Every structure is written in structure tokens, then in C-alpha cells.
Amino acid sequence: MKFMKLGSRPDTFYTSEDLRCVSSEVSSDFTIEVSGSRYLLHKFPLLSKCLRLQRMCSESPESIIQLPEFPGGVEAFELCAKFCYGITITISAYNIVAARCAAEYLQMSEEVEKGNLVYKLEVFFNSCILNGWRDSIVTLQTTKAFPLWSEDLAITSRCIEAIASKVLSHPSKVSLSHSHSRRVRDDDMSSNRAAASSRGWWAEDIAELGIDLYWRTMIAIKSGGKVPASLIGDALRVYASKWLPTLQRNRKVVKKKEDSDSDSDTDTSSKHRLLLESIISLLPAEKGAVSCSFLLKLLKAANILNASTSSKMELARRVALQLEEATVSDLLIPPMSYKSELLYDVDIVATILEQFMVQGQTSPPTSPLRGKKGMMDRRRRSRSAENIDLEFQESRRSSSASHSSKLKVAKLVDGYLQQIARDVNLPLSKFVTLAESVPEFSRLDHDDLYRAIDIYLKAHKNLNKSERKRVCRVLDCKKLSMEACMHAAQNEMLPLRVVVQVLFYEQARAAAATNNGEKNTTELPSNIKALLAAHNIDPSNPNAAAFSTTTSIAAPEDRWSVSGLKSPKSKLSGTLRSKLAEDEEVDERFMNGDGGRTPSRFKAFCAIPGRPKKMFSKLLSINRNSSDKNC
């Protein structure tokens, strides 16, 4: 870092009791009071360089000159006083702002004397400070102590312009970075890490700035248009990780604020909130400029710090654009207040999903013409038609990417449902709404969804039958794997109609496989046998489908398995036949009573035969007829 020395005389200032004096053969004739400190000085050296002191002495006959609100305090005043006496002073990036403001206050300009302090400081500032990377940043940091003076003297704006111009003109000049050079010395970084770090060499250095100065600097860098959006995003991530407290610490801050509304806690939260909202306003508009994980971390902090609704909605919109990159842990956003009974903020995730579905609602384009006619037409195409084809191909790729994204998001949502299902205070409506927000085609299988439903039913054992049916109506039994079906068959938390539906579709699969010649034997597949055996059903004797009363079993763990089916103790409580009859009566009351309009999805769910008892006989008779034919 650069510095400048002015004057040649040794320092003769000394302290006597409560006074600061100058050792001289001439007695002092001038008393100045600055910030409670008194100086016994001489008029001639001071008045010859300070126009303000000249005017104050001529206007006031008092022997003591008061300098209230002196910029920089006694340190800055003493620098100016020593300059007047010709005593050696050292000016650097750390004290040039204080010295410049003090010199301006005392009016040490060229009007009073050529080569005065203001002129010398300006020359050093423009020729040395602004040309140095580290000097510019340090000087900009020191302007925080003198915001009004620094703005009036254009010190702040000139430092910001100098920093931005160096970032824009030297994007690969890593040697400028103080933080990067220090890190390379301390850390033996790999070549890949060093290369990635060198691209954003400036990010860590300007991260030392306060949020107001940082925001203005980043605006200047962004307006230059030469720095890629990804590097802007990396710089914001570096700054957020440095100044935003961790989420755990944030939660403690919020909890303390709720427990005791002290001014200090309120100020801390307000500062963090301002910092967060400023970072959000600086986010690049380009998709992928910042990672989805970073956006969701900002959203978590926004929820905890109670940021503005507009800031949270902006983050939700940005997250929706790249939601397929998120993980389940990223979506576990804590609620706004510790007073909330819910473990996670499900509403904000529902908003993100809604935004994701809205921006992905583009119909896939139709396929191009094929065949000889299409080939002949293709030969006669004009250049404009070729351009249309290119747009068509881009549209297809975009549509394919959208479809792939929805498949990933569906998997993500099912994993998220498994996590929030453990919350005993999670309302049924929120769980169902979130499960239904995913398009049906995006779930290739329903195993993860079934696992989430199973967890929810076990965590909410006080649900009545209609509520359990409402939870299960989004489940498509045709998309369950063999393992999931076998688990569902012994899951006493499921509505019995779902169990029957599982058996029905498994039998239908077995029959279809037999008709297609995939089975040379008339025996039921082993998984169907296991399902029926779990309910004490003899597949060879439909009339003997009596179901013995059993004792209830303990609910399986969240990670269900089929090992329980092999145990002779694994049975459903109550008789299946009586429960089917009871279940049928409840369905009829629900469909014909005061249930109102029946949702279309629920109608599809109830598309199995109307009388489950007859359905069981029908299933078994199909198998029996098949056996007779092969005899």
C-alpha cells in the first residue's frame, strides 16, 4: 500500500495535564478546543494556512476557539496542525479520508496558500490511492465514518468508480487481489480450485465492504456489462456467506427477539433484513447465475428474518425456474415464527411449485411430416422454412427439458412429502394439496408417494375414514411396485378400499401376463399368493374366503419392507369381509350424502367395482376358470 510523507521537522507535540502543547521558544497565543481536548498553539502557523480559523479569530474576540463536530476528531485535527508547523506526517489509505475532511473543514485551500494541504491530499488521492486496488477498497471502507463529507467531496463515488473499472478492465489480473494472494500462500489449492477462484478474484476483497457501499459497487460492476452473470452470482454468494449469519444463529436471533423485544435485538434483525433484501435486489436476471441451493438458503433466511413479501416472492419465482436442481433438505424451510406449530413452512413450497407449474405450461409441438411426401417438400423448402425448422427443434428441446424437469420435481416433491408427513400438526389439506400439485404423468411410479402417505397416516392416527380416503385418493395403485403392493396389503392404516384395489390390479396384471404367454403355469404369481395369504384367502376356493379375526400388529417403520409378510403373525385386524361391507356403507353415505360435489380425481379413485365383496369373488373365479381350462 502506498503512503505519502509531508513535512520534515520532528514531532514536538506533547501532553501537559489536560492540554496538548507544542514545544517552542515562543509562548503560545492561541487556544483551540476540539472534541473536549484543548490545544495551546500559535496563531501564525495556523492562520497562515487555515481560512476558517482566520475568520473565526476576526469574528470572535474570545481567547478560546471552539471547533464543534470536527470531522475525524482530535487525530485529524492534530494531522492538520502538524502540517501547519511543518512537522512530518504520514498519509495513507487509512487516514486520507479523515485528513481530507478535516482540511476541508479548516478551509486549507489554495486560496490561502499555494501547495496547501487540500491540494497535496487531492494529488496523492488521484495519482496513488485510486490507482491501487487495495488502497481504493481501504479508502472506501473509511468513508463510512464520514458519509456526508465523503459524498460532498466525491471521495466515495471516485473510489467506487476506480474499483469497478479495475474489475471490468482486468478480469484475470489475480495479482491485484489481496485476499486471493493471501489464500494461495496459506492454502495449497488444487489447480481446478485455483482456476475457479481466479475468475472471481475480486469477490472476496469487496466482500469486506458494508452493505451500502457493496451495493453501490456491485451496481457499478453490473452496469459495465463485461462481467458474466455467473461471476456476479458467485460474488453475491461470497458476500452472503460472510455477512449473513448461519440459519441456526438466525433462529436464535429471532427467538430472542420474540422473547424480549429489546432495541438491540430489533436493530440486529433489521440490519440482517436490510442486508438480505439488498442481496436479493442484486441477483442477476439470468437463469442459473446462482444455484438453486443458494436461492433456497436466502429464502430460509428471508423467512426467519421476516423479510418483505416482495423479496420472498422474488426468491420463490427464481427458485421455481430451476427447481429441478433442489434437494429435499433445501426445501425444509423453517416457519417465520417460533410460535408456529408447524415444523416447516409448507405454504412457501406450495407457492414455488405453483410458480414452477405456471412457467412450464407449454404444450409440446407436433411431430414433423414423415415419408416420401415430406422428403420432397423438404427439398423445396426455402431458407425461411429452414429457420422455422430450427425454431421448431429448439422448441422441442425446450419441451423435452420441461418434461424432464417435471419428472425430477415430482421425485423431489414425494421426498419432501415424506419429510413433512412426520409433522403431527401438518393439516390434511396442506399435505393433499401439495401431493396433488404434481401432474399425474410426472410420477412414473407411486412408491415414494405411497411411502409419504404411509408416514402421514402413522403420524396422524386420529384421522377418520373419510380423511384417510382423502389422503389416499391421489395414490394410483397401478403404479405401485410389487414390494409396495405387498406392504400395502398388510397396512392396516390404509382404507380397505385401497387394499382391495391393490389386490385387484395385481390380479389383473397376473391375468394379462398369462394371456400374453408370459406364464406357462396356471398358478398365481408368488406375489399375489403372498397378498392373498396375508388375508387368509384360499385362491383355489372362493367360497371359503372366510377371514378370521386377528390381533392387531405394530405399525411398520417408515422404510417399509415385505419381510413381515413371511411371518405367520402378520395379519390384519378384524374380518376383511365385515370391514368391506362397512367401508361400502361409508362410501355410499359420502357419495350420496352431504358431501356435495365429488372431485373427478376421487371418482377415478372409486373406479373399482362398486361392491368389493363381489369383486373378490370375481377375482377368485377368474383364476379358477383359468385353472379349469388348463386341466
Curated annotation (Swiss-Prot):
<dbReference type="InterPro" id="IPR043454">
    <property type="entry name" value="NPH3/RPT2-like"/>
</dbReference>
<comment type="pathway">
    <text>Protein modification; protein ubiquitination.</text>
</comment>
<feature type="domain" description="BTB">
    <location>
        <begin position="28"/>
        <end position="93"/>
    </location>
</feature>
<feature type="domain" description="NPH3">
    <location>
        <begin position="200"/>
        <end position="509"/>
    </location>
</feature>
<feature type="modified residue" description="Phosphotyrosine">
    <location>
        <position position="450"/>
    </location>
</feature>
<dbReference type="InterPro" id="IPR027356">
    <property type="entry name" value="NPH3_dom"/>
</dbReference>
<feature type="modified residue" description="Phosphoserine">
    <location>
        <position position="567"/>
    </location>
</feature>
<feature type="region of interest" description="Disordered">
    <location>
        <begin position="361"/>
        <end position="399"/>
    </location>
</feature>
<dbReference type="GO" id="GO:0016567">
    <property type="term" value="P:protein ubiquitination"/>
</dbReference>
<dbReference type="Pfam" id="PF03000">
    <property type="entry name" value="NPH3"/>
</dbReference>
<comment type="function">
    <text>May act as a substrate-specific adapter of an E3 ubiquitin-protein ligase complex (CUL3-RBX1-BTB) which mediates the ubiquitination and subsequent proteasomal degradation of target proteins.</text>
</comment>
<keyword id="KW-0833">Ubl conjugation pathway</keyword>
<feature type="compositionally biased region" description="Basic residues">
    <location>
        <begin position="370"/>
        <end position="382"/>
    </location>
</feature>
<comment type="similarity">
    <text>Belongs to the NPH3 family.</text>
</comment>
<protein>
    <recommendedName>
        <fullName>BTB/POZ domain-containing protein At1g67900</fullName>
    </recommendedName>
</protein>
<keyword id="KW-0597">Phosphoprotein</keyword>
<dbReference type="InterPro" id="IPR011333">
    <property type="entry name" value="SKP1/BTB/POZ_sf"/>
</dbReference>
